[in-house]
């Protein structure tokens, strides 16, 4: 008799996705981040659900309700800090996952890649709205500054901003709708993840060599389930060290001051994972130009399949492209640092140079270097 897992309509889907899935035999630890992102999403949804049970989305009580969670709810501090630092772990895994895709040419899976970019945008939107909820100083001013960027859109800009605010400034209506969206979006993310996996399983996974691996596949279970469990344990270990020893390491002290529309903090800055985009936004003096650069800094990822001019898929055997890739990584780290610095000399010029370099490497240098490598290999 055939095994139930292979015949049952529901279990069959799980079987084909996580058990009997044919997987390349040579995928490295860089392929662990997909499952780690799934784990992060599960942690965020669970901790978020328990936080939502005690949180109130009203300007008068939001800050107090978060304090109440930390002080009076059983293990509320643990849930709150796991949720806050879980977001940081989520973004670390996201950046490494995207970087892996760029390095090994996974973007040639067109649909999977584009859905991944959409996922990145939705996760960024969710994280931004979550940061507004504690209603501290940085929450309020962050929301004001970022939503105000939409006013750069010609003609309809200001109307659009006031429509999003639900009034003439960031207030109760804004907080309530942000909470509603912050609650619903993770479930939309989960649905998108399923579509992401659906398209991935149409083609099968890429591998470090970038070569077709149909002739050498192994079952996902037990080989990669055990590998994923190791990754998961390491992720939980790092997250717990962060939560239990220095929960506020990545946060902003200003957010422990209740929101006050009458006093602006000296330096308004978003969470660390948005700083690279924030630096690009600030490096252009023109408001609309800055907003366009900000949007394009993420959407540029969608151009990767079109900018791939190399005859090889992966960068594994392309030393020149590897050099440019790591310069790009260093550039992004520089942008992240600049995003957290005040707007003054020499930070302004460093930010502008790093922003120019970011777009130049992706749009010009990487494709050119690919063509040079083709020539060197007489392809």
Curated annotation (Swiss-Prot):
One of its GO terms (cellular component) is respiratory chain complex III. GO terms for molecular function: metal ion binding; ubiquinol-cytochrome-c reductase activity. The keyword Iron applies. This is Cytochrome b. Component of the ubiquinol-cytochrome c reductase complex (complex III or cytochrome b-c1 complex) that is part of the mitochondrial respiratory chain. The b-c1 complex mediates electron transfer from ubiquinol to cytochrome c. Contributes to the generation of a proton gradient across the mitochondrial membrane that is then used for ATP synthesis. A ubiquinone binds at residue 201. It holds the Pfam family Cytochrom_B_C. Heme b b566 binds at residues 97, 196. It comes from Marmota caudata. Belongs to the cytochrome b family. It is a multi-pass membrane protein. The gene is MT-CYB. The chain crosses the membrane at residues 33-53, 77-98, 113-133, 178-198, 226-246, 288-308, 320-340, 347-367. Its main location: mitochondrion. PROSITE patterns: CYTB_CTER (PS51003), CYTB_NTER (PS51002). GO terms for biological process: mitochondrial electron transport, ubiquinol to cytochrome c. Keywords: Electron transport, Heme, Iron, Membrane, Metal-binding, Mitochondrion, Mitochondrion inner membrane, Respiratory chain, Transmembrane, Transmembrane helix, Transport, Ubiquinone. Heme b b562 binds at residues 83, 182. The cytochrome bc1 complex contains 11 subunits: 3 respiratory subunits (MT-CYB, CYC1 and UQCRFS1), 2 core proteins (UQCRC1 and UQCRC2) and 6 low-molecular weight proteins (UQCRH/QCR6, UQCRB/QCR7, UQCRQ/QCR8, UQCR10/QCR9, UQCR11/QCR10 and a cleavage product of UQCRFS1). This cytochrome bc1 complex then forms a dimer. Heme 1 (or BL or b562) is low-potential and absorbs at about 562 nm, and heme 2 (or BH or b566) is high-potential and absorbs at about 566 nm. Its cofactor is heme b. It comes from the Eukaryota.
């Amino acid at each position: 008799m055939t095994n139930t897992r292979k015949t049952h309509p529901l279990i069959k889907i799980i079987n084909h996705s996580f058990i009997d899935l044919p997987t390349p035999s040579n995928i490295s630890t860089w392929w662990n981040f997909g499952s780690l992102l799934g784990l992060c999403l599960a942690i965020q949804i669970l901790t978020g659900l328990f936080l939502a049970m005690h949180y109130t989305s009203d300007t008068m009580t939001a800050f107090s309700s978060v304090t109440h969670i930390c002080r009076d709810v059983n293990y509320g501090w643990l849930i709150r800090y796991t949720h806050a630092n879980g977001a940081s772990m989520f973004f670390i895994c996201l950046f490494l996952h995207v970087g892996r895709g760029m390095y090994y040419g996974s973007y040639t899976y067109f649909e999977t890649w584009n859905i991944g970019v959409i996922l990145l945008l939705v996760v960024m939107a969710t994280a931004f709205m979550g940061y507004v909820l504690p209603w501290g100083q940085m929450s309020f001013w962050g929301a004001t500054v970022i939503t105000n960027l939409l006013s750069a859109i010609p003609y309809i800009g200001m109307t659009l901003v006031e429509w999003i605010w639900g009034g003439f400034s960031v207030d109760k209506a804004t907080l309530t709708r942000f909470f509603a969206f912050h609650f619903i979006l993770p479930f939309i993310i989960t649905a998108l993840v399923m579509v992401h996996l659906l398209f991935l399983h149409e083609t099968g996974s890429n591998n470090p060599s970038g070569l077709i691996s149909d002739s050498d596949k192994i079952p996902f279970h037990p080989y990669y389930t055990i590998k994923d469990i190791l990754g998961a344990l390491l992720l939980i270990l790092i997250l717990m060290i962060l939560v239990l020893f220095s929960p506020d390491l990545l946060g902003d002290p200003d957010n422990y001051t209740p929101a006050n529309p009458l006093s602006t903090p000296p330096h308004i800055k978003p969470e660390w994972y948005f700083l690279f985009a924030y630096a690009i936004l600030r490096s252009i003096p023109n408001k609309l130009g800055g907003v366009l650069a900000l949007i394009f800094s993420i959407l540029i990822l969608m151009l990767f399949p079109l900018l791939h001019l190399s005859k090889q898929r992966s960068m594994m055997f392309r030393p020149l492209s590897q050099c440019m890739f790591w310069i790009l990584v260093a550039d992004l780290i520089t942008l992240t640092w600049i995003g957290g610095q005040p707007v003054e000399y020499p930070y302004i010029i460093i930010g502008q140079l790093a922003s120019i370099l970011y777009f130049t490497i992706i749009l010009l240098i990487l494709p050119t270097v690919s063509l040079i490598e083709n020539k060197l290999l007489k392809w």
